[in-house]
């Protein structure tokens, strides 16, 4: 008997939870992404290729640091200098982002 009363409650709550999650996620590409940035950033926004807190042009992440020395010499020597650029397109077009993530691209 209790099972029958739980089903309608679940059928009511699941769409609410999904819509709340969807409301917190934005996803747009091309001109729509530019329009979202213009709305979120009235004082302008940073380059599409740079976000606060990411690596600079000459910075790198050493992806070989976790490997043993016997493994690392087999790897391509250039693989340790992999620049990890993440822009607004990566954050809000290829996957969804929150409004606060979108605001991180705004000029101060």
UniProtKB/Swiss-Prot annotation:
PROSITE patterns per the UniProt record, alphabetical: INSULIN
Subcellular location as annotated: Secreted
The keyword Nucleotide-binding is assigned to this record: no
GO biological process, one term: carbohydrate homeostasis
Keyword tRNA processing: no
InterPro entries referenced in this protein's UniProt entry, alphabetically: Insulin-like, Insulin-like_sf, Insulin_CS, Insulin_family
Signal peptide: 1-22
Disulfide bonds: 29-93, 41-106, 92-97
Expression tissues: Expressed at a high level in seven cells of each larval brain hemisphere that may correspond to neurosecretory cells. Expressed at a moderate level in the larval gut.
Chief subcellular location: secreted
Role this protein plays: Ligand of InR/insulin-like receptor.
Protein name stated in the entry: Insulin-like peptide 5
Gene: Ilp5
